[in-house]
Amino acid sequence: MKKVLVLVSLLTALAVTAGDNSNISVEAGYNNQYIVNGVARSEGTPFVGVGAVKSLKYADVYLGGTLLANGDLDQSHWTLGAGKEVNVWKDVFSARLDTTVTRHQAGNFGIPNSTEFGVKLALPNKIVTPYVRGYYDVDLKQSGVFVGAERAQKLPFGFVVTPGVEYGKVEDYTAVNAKLALTRPFETSFGVFTPFVSAGWYDNNFNTTKYNWATREFSGDIVYSGGLRLTF
């Protein structure tokens, strides 16, 4: 309940400070696995989340939080970030650089709380968006680099499908996944409602007998989630 109140308080503060070039989102749903850097951090949990983006002159600043509600085993994950996209080749591709700091609060789940710093470079274009990202977790003493690609494709009747693939090399494991997300935005007078679903194939060689920051090893497992998002 305490973390739910924190989310509500955060949303209220974001709503008060929002203005032009800003948007706020609220979402709720369910996932069978919550993924952090290619490994499972929670299993079979409903979730709620809030987020806000403010576009400033030199960067987009964003803040968000997700609560995985599971009684005494709840978790929360909080991210503060900033990013900037610049045009590299007009009408061909651009470059976007993001830096983030994320706090992982595992509650009583048995996974240590930790703080993670990340950076991501993407090359958005009309065909496919490749990216490379890296992170360092100061509490888990883990660093890793991930490379991937994704593409958002409009479909008939307002649907958008986004396939993606990613491979990562972390100090104590490797991870790979291929996933597909489907959304259908509905514009209303007070915001955009977006139902969303996603499913993916995940594999890694994480050793749960040696390390305690994931719940299991993936061996070609299917990970899925679904929910509803409101953006205003």
Predicted regions and their residues:
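Residues that define the transmembrane beta-barrel architecture of outer-membrane proteins
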Residues: S22, S42-V48, D74-W78, I111-F117, ...
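Short loop/turn motifs that connect adjacent beta-strands in outer-membrane beta-barrel proteins
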Residues: A18-N23, S55-D60, N87-R96, F109, ...
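Short glycine/proline- and aromatic-enriched beta-strand/turn motifs that initiate or cap beta-hairpins
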Residues: A18-N70
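Outer-membrane beta-barrel "beta-signal"
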Residues: L180-L182, F186, F218-F232
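Outer membrane beta-barrel transmembrane domains
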Residues: F157-N212
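Transmembrane beta-strands of outer-membrane beta-barrel pores
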Residues: Y30-V36, L56-Y58, G65-G71, V86, ...
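Cleavable N-terminal export/targeting peptides
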Residues: M1-S25, T231-F232
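Membrane-embedded beta-strand positions of outer-membrane beta-barrel proteins
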Residues: V26-A28, V61-G65, L97-V101, V119, ...
